[in-house]
Swiss-Prot record:
Record protein name field: BAG family molecular chaperone regulator 4
Region listing for Disordered, in residue ranges: 1-40, 241-269
Induction of its expression: By cold, by salicylic acid (SA), by abscisic acid (ABA) and by pathogen B.cinerea attack.
Organism of provenance: Arabidopsis thaliana
Positions with biased composition (Basic and acidic residues): 21-35
Gene Ontology BP, a term: vegetative to reproductive phase transition of meristem
Key words of the record: Chaperone
Keyword check for Chaperone: yes
Effect of D189S: Abolishes interaction with HSP70-1
Position of the signal peptide: none
Membrane-spanning parts: none
UniProt KW Chaperone keyword: yes
Length: 269
């Protein structure tokens, strides 16, 4: 008995010689494409194992080769408990961007990455200091005192020039300069300052104290002009020469010329 090709495709011989009709699901399974073994292995190869070093700790991660370094950070957050913003990932000594893919950077199976934890305290120190209204007010007050002290400093310099030049300066000039300096010192003492304003105030206090010391020294020199022994000796010598020379600052002439003059007068007589 002859069967056409269609009928032959609907029957199959089972072990033992039994002829049975082929089931639909078996027939449909014959038409399903078989999975390419190469593509299956390629899909398996998409997952790689990398080692991430964090100080003395090492973490093994199984991750897709197409993942990014940001994905690695997320995986490390779960293992270490650190914040992703604190982590820096280095591969081959170069810090990698979060959006960069592992495969594009050359990361392969068994590659090693290094994680560095950023010092958050250092990052906070680098931020510009917050200037409050109170700080601005303190800085302005210290600057105002600085301007007044500049004027008083010029006055002290003028007093020093006068004293060094031998000018007799009234005592009240030194007392007035000292009083004005003390007023500015009291102003600084009443300024509540922090940060840069505090440093500036401290420097200005030291400056005023130095000027006060200079005024006291000038006043002492003016009250006792011979306090400088070298200058006193020079003035005394000049006065002695003036007395001995009878109206001349030069020392008196030697006795021998006087004898000659006497002899001339005798000859004249």
């Amino acid at each position: 008995m002859m069967h056409n090709s269609t009928e032959e495709s609907e029957w199959e011989v089972r072990p033992g010689g039994m002829l049975v009709q082929r089931r639909d699901d078996a027939a449909s399974s014959d038409h399903k494409p078989l999975q390419d073994p190469d593509s299956a292995s390629a899909a398996f190869a998409q997952t790689i194992r990398i080692t991430v070093s964090h100080g003395s700790s090492h973490h093994d991660l199984h991750i897709s080769a197409h993942a990014t370094f940001g994905d690695v950070k997320k995986a490390l957050v779960q293992k270490t408990g650190l914040e992703a913003s604190e982590l820096k990932i280095l591969f081959r000594g170069v810090e990698r961007d979060d959006a960069e893919q592992l495969q594009a950077a050359g990361v392969k199976d068994a590659s090693k990455l290094v994680v560095v934890v950023e010092d958050t305290n250092k990052r906070v120190e680098q931020q510009p200091p917050v200037v409050t209204k109170e700080m601005e007010k303190a800085i302005a007050a210290v600057n105002a005192v600085t301007g007044e002290v500049d004027k008083l400093s010029d006055r002290v310099v003028a007093l020093e020039v006068a004293v060094n030049g031998g000018t007799q300066v009234a005592v009240r000039e030194f007392d007035m300069a000292a009083e004005l300096l003390m007023r500015q010192l009291l102003k600084l003492d009443g300024i509540e300052a922090e940060g840069d304003a505090k440093v500036q105030r401290k420097a200005e206090v030291r400056r005023i104290q130095n000027l006060q010391e200079a005024v006291d020294k000038l006043k002492a020199r003016c009250s006792n002009p011979f306090v400088d022994q070298s200058k006193a000796a020079a003035v005394s010598t000049e006065w002695e020469s003036f007395g001995n020379g009878v109206g001349s600052l030069n020392p008196p002439p030697p006795a021998s010329p006087s004898a000659n003059v006497t002899q001339d007068w005798e000859k004249f007589d």
